[in-house]
């Protein structure tokens, strides 16, 4: 019989390098999330249970240890029930793979699988009304270089209904604007590809942005160091204009606005414009229409009166175009990107 420690190491390595990466074709973000949770659990065993690293095996994933870990996650780390459930799902995924490799781990997996998910009430996601969107966008100084980039970035978040990961991974090669119906090609969750069509106003400002920034290759949005913009970087940008827009639009004071709020707002606006749910599902890249149905919960009469029609948030005026010229050094750096 293979030693437990060696067996564990081998199964753990193959789970990530072969099963998740090659067989299930996980995206980088999802892969990293799974890796983080398993690492967190192993660190918990080492630091809280005082189990030596060399002695940690699949048998360390027993039901009591997992229950203690989940309690630690909720009570000490203050994670939500939703996060707690997600961590349990990831642990179960690993154990399911382990028992498929070696059936002696079936009992370990079944006992872990018997742990119930915690019920929790779904929090309603805040969305922006048409007026709030306009107020938000007006706080952006598009006459500045950074401001214009932020304007294009946020407009694209909303108009294309993008997830943050989809936005920051968007490359020039994902833009297909010469087509009769311009579109962008998105690689979403689970490496699922989808096409999002854009109206002419959006295409116009993106082309203007590309021209002024001299972008020919690589990622569409870069940070100050000319590196790929990060999720944290997008959050900082949104927070900056959220603080400014609250002063101009008091109704935003009671809302929590995140990068995802723009994707959610677009979905709500489409729904209120009587767009069929299957079309919204396809637009957002949801694998199940049940996920899309979450948006139905917030379409009450009050919201119906506040949203007239899904429309563009871009001011198609010449003044909305950048007035500064591109930086030659920036263009040179972008051209050298691999």
Predicted regions and their residues:
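Conserved catalytic core of the tyrosine transesterase superfamily
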Residues: 1-338
């Amino acid at each position: 019989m293979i030693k437990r420690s060696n067996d564990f190491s081998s199964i753990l390595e193959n789970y990530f390098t072969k099963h998740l990466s090659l067989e299930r074709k996980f995206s980088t973000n999802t892969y990293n999330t799974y890796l983080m949770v398993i690492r967190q659990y192993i660190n918990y065993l080492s630091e809280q249970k005082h189990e030596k690293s060399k002695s940690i095996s699949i048998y360390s994933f027993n039901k009591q240890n997992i229950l203690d870990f989940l309690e630690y996650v909720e009570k000490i780390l203050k994670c939500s029930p939703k996060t707690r459930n997600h961590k349990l799902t990831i642990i179960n995924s690993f154990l399911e793979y382990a028992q498929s490799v070696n059936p002696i781990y079936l009992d370990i997996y079944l006992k872990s699988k018997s742990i119930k998910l915690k019920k929790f009430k779904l929090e309603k996601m805040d969305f922006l009304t048409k007026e709030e969107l306009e107020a938000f966008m007006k706080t952006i100084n598009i006459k500045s270089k950074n401001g214009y980039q932020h304007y294009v970035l946020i407009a694209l978040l909303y108009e294309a209904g993008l997830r943050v990961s989809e936005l920051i991974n968007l490359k020039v090669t994902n833009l297909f604007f010469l087509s009769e119906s311009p579109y962008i090609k998105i690689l979403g969750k689970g490496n699922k590809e989808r096409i999002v069509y854009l109206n002419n106003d959006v295409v116009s400002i993106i082309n203007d942005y590309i021209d002024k920034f001299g972008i020919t290759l690589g990622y569409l949005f870069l940070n100050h160091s000319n590196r790929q913009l990060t999720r944290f970087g997008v959050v900082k940008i949104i927070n900056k204009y959220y603080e400014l827009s609250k002063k101009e639009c008091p109704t935003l004071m009671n809302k929590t606005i995140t990068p995802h709020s723009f994707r959610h707002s677009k979905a709500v606006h489409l729904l209120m414009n009587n767009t069929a749910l299957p079309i919204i599902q396809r637009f957002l890249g949801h694998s199940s229409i049940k996920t899309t149905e979450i948006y139905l919960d917030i379409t009450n009469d009050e919201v119906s009166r506040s949203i007239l029609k899904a429309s563009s948030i871009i001011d198609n005026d010449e003044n909305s175009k950048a007035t500064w010229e591109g930086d030659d050094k920036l263009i040179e750096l972008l051209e050298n990107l691999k």
